Structure formats: C-alpha cells, structure tokens
C-alpha cells in the first residue's frame, strides 16, 4: 500500500506543477468547463435519482431493518428488498428511495461498506437506464488481489484518483476472495490515471494487474481471433534426451522462429514438453499439421495450439461432460433404483431377487463409511424391456419383510429439477386449496378454527413457525393478518372483536365427506408436527425447514410413517429434499 501511496502522491505533485506552468487564461477555461459539467451532472442526478442500490445483504434483512439503518440520514419515500417471485426469499439486494439527493449522497458517504447483520453492504446510486448501466467506459479490472483486500480497502485505494461509482471484489460461494475485482469510475480519465499509477504496483505484497474492463462478448471475440491466428504451439511426448538445438531444428524447417524452449525442472532435467513461437501463423499451422502424431526419437509427438490455463480447463470440462452424458445415455432406461431394502440384503441377494427378469450387468447396495447398508441400491439390466418388466413386477413386492420401492433411476439434477417444478406448481394452486379448506371447515360447523400457515406444499404443524410465502406481499381481500377465520358472532359488528369481511363457503360438502376430510387433515397435521421436529433439528433455517417438511409430507402417509421410524431412510429423503430446495433457489436466482 505504501508503494501506491508514494506513486499517487508523486503523480499529484506532477499534476500540480503542470497546472502552475500553464497560463492563467488556459487554466481557467477547463476549470469553467469542468464546473459546468459537474453542475450539470449533479443537477441530473438530483432531478432524476434519489434512489440507492444496496447490495451484499444478508438473506434475513427486511425492509423494517433497512429503514432503521437509513432513515436517520434523511426522509425516505420507500424501501424494497428484492425477493424471489416464488419462494419470497431475499435476492441479497434492495433499493432505498430518499425524497432528496443530498440524503442519498450522505447515506453513501456514511453507510457504504457498513455492516448490517454482520455483513458489509455495498451502496451505489441506482441507475434505471440499462444503457448507462452497461456502459463500461470508466470500469477497470484488477487481478492478483491479496485475500485480505475487501470492497472497502479497494475503494479506499482507488478513490484517490476520482469519484468511484461502485467497487466490488469477486467472492466464491464461501465468501472468500477470488483474487480479482472491479472499480467503476465516474470519469474515464480517472480510470486511465488509476491504471497508469497502480498497474504493476504492490498491494499487500502482491503485484496487481490493472486494466480497462473488457466485456465478456469482446473477450470471446478476441479469443476466437487469437485462436484463428495462433503463432505459439505446444509440444509434448518429447524424448528427455532431446537437446534444445535438436528441438529448435525440428521446427525451424517450417518458418522463422521467435523462440523455442524445452521446459525443465529445478534440477535442469527436461519435463518432456516445450513451446515454439513462430513469426507467422501459417508456419505454426503447417508445423501442427505435419508434426502432430509424427514419431521423433521413437515417440509420437503431440503438437497443437498453445492454450491458456482456463482454456484447457474449459476444454477438459466439456470432454468430461460429454463423457458423462454418453454414459448416462448408455444406461438410460436400464438402471433401476430400489429403496426400502432390509439391512440383510447385500449385492448378491439383490442380484438374485432381480435375476429372473433378465441379464443383470451390475447390482449394488449402497453403504456408508462403516459398511452399513443405506437401505437403497441399484440394479442395471442389459435392455430397457427387462428393466421395465422388473420394475412392474417387483415394485411394492415384500422382500425380507419390507415392501420394495422400484423405479427407473434418474440423475440427481433431473430429480431436483422435477421436484422444483412440482414445488412451483403446488405453490400456484395453494391459495385455491386454502379457500376450499376454509369452506369445508365452515360447512362442518367449526367457528373460529385456526388455519395454520402453509409449508411449500402442505399445512404447517400447529405451534411451529412455518413460513408463509405470501406474508411479505399484500394480504388478500378479507383475510385477516393473524391467519384466523373469525367466529360468526364477530361478523355482525359485535363489540367483542374486530370486524372482517368473511369468506362465504364456496362449496357445500356432504357430511361424510367433511368428516373424512377433517380426519385426513388431522393425520397430516400430526405427521407434520413430528416431521418438522426432525427436520428443524437438522437445519437452522426455519424457512428451509418448513419447505423441506412440506416436500416430505407430500409422500403417501404410510411412507411418511416409515421415514419417522427409520432414521437412515429419513436421512436419505431429507438430503434429497434439501438438495432439491437449494437447487430450486439457485435456479430462481439465476433467472432473476
């Protein structure tokens, strides 16, 4: 940091000297122009923008909490925490709208990077025009940052060069620095000054690289251009006895060489690969075409375009993904998933059970680290017809005293996606179901019955704080905030309670259907209470606990009872539901 400070001070001194040497008249002209520009800019902001963007927020932050933080600095017209449209979970940012520009400016000065709920927030002016938001003329990119440098430290470093609109260090999923960041200056000239002063300097002992930010589409375009006109090639499978002279001579026949080098270890021994840089692209392309696969000193050479590390990683990732998809396609429809296995069932017994239905290529019971059965496994047949026959006949069949669950095995991501879609569909029809429940309760003569808050797909157990996806939005007409359906004696304006516009029954059910319905609800409520206790003991997030309970409770009651009695089966189902819930949240955040 001291190196940067010294250079910055030196730069400022040089600027002052240059200003003193200029004639007074020429100095005054740009000053007037600058002041007019600044006044125009400020006037524009004052007239059009008293709204702040507040980012990096803790998921539990509410509008009320933000009001307590921001209201002391000036009158606020509105606050909105941006939330997922389905789950109502916070997206981690909000908008605070002041009634005047000065209050917003003061908030940025005093609260930017201040901790809210233990997490430093990031504040900047909200820009409604997408064209201006995407304009990157004053945006710079910094890499090789020390892990200790955060948003505030980066802002303090670069604010000496001019007004900073926003500043951000990229973080991974665990909140750790990824070693690079961005600083957006109001003026492009300030960005250029910062690049000139800081690029190559030391920050916390690390030499940083600073340059103008290049949009992704431009980077990809330049990369494709570089690929098409490469001059640097990579060579491997080189005999370790090969000398530098032999290596250069092998490639010099194709054109003029800028450099040719064999990579060596600390002891000076060749590593078996090297690089050759040609002057002309055509020479490099010809060398790749003629020498790739050719034997040199009894070894087949690999010769190809030299790639950057991230390119190689991306290529390997694509190869792995292609291999994975090919493997999945190969086993599509032939691999069965079997659960509710007795602990006595091992691989051989599992294979024996399914052998009558066709040729089995593999059968495996999944086990934990201690070798104990997890209660589920997989059987792979040689054809989809055999697998379908086995699934049809073995599903719900009693084996070792337990009914088997047999289904076609699905990939985790497919299962999670299906669960997420089911959650969305249930959520959309939940309000209609709630109305029907209220109508049935009213028809059954149950005045003042408490309608519990809803889980993702079901009613929450009584006495537990299950989340209600609609609580953060406006209440429906005639629905009291406390979730109670008031008793009939309160509808007539009696003084013993507040008046509500009641919701009349929409359907009249026969008495025996009402009793059956009520019995079902009692059973679901009892199971929900027990499930919620087990789920909430494994996860601290009440919102997630409620939704996971709802997903599990959507299973048939008999299966839910089995889960409550069997901890291993419960653990498996819990992990699947948790993974589906997390995947659903990520998908919604990506769409937003």
Swiss-Prot record:
SUPFAM superfamilies: PABC (PABP) domain (SSF63570), RNA-binding domain, RBD (SSF54928)
Composition bias, Low complexity: 21-43
Region (Disordered): 1-43
GO CC field: cytoplasm; nucleus
Record key words, sorted: Cytoplasm, mRNA processing, mRNA transport, Nucleus, Repeat, RNA-binding, Translation regulation, Transport
BP GO annotations: mRNA processing; mRNA transport; regulation of translation
The family this protein is said to belong to: Belongs to the polyadenylate-binding protein type-1 family.
Location of the PABC domain: 507-586
Occurrences of domain RRM (ranges): 50-128, 138-215, 231-308, 334-411
SMART domains: PolyA, RRM, RRM_1
Pfam family, one: MLLE
Transmembrane segments: none
Function according to Swiss-Prot or TrEMBL: Binds the poly(A) tail of mRNA. Appears to be an important mediator of the multiple roles of the poly(A) tail in mRNA biogenesis, stability and translation. In the nucleus, involved in both mRNA cleavage and polyadenylation. Is also required for efficient mRNA export to the cytoplasm. Acts in concert with a poly(A)-specific nuclease (PAN) to affect poly(A) tail shortening, which may occur concomitantly with either nucleocytoplasmic mRNA transport or translational initiation.
Organism, scientific name: Kluyveromyces lactis (strain ATCC 8585 / CBS 2359 / DSM 70799 / NBRC 1267 / NRRL Y-1140 / WM37)
Protein's UniProt name: Polyadenylate-binding protein, cytoplasmic and nuclear
Localization annotation: Cytoplasm; Nucleus
InterPro entries assigned: Nucleotide-bd_a/b_plait_sf, PABP-dom, PABP_1234, PABP_HYD_C, PABP_RRM1, RBD_domain_sf, RRM2_I_PABPs, RRM_dom
Annotated NCBIfam families: PABP-1234
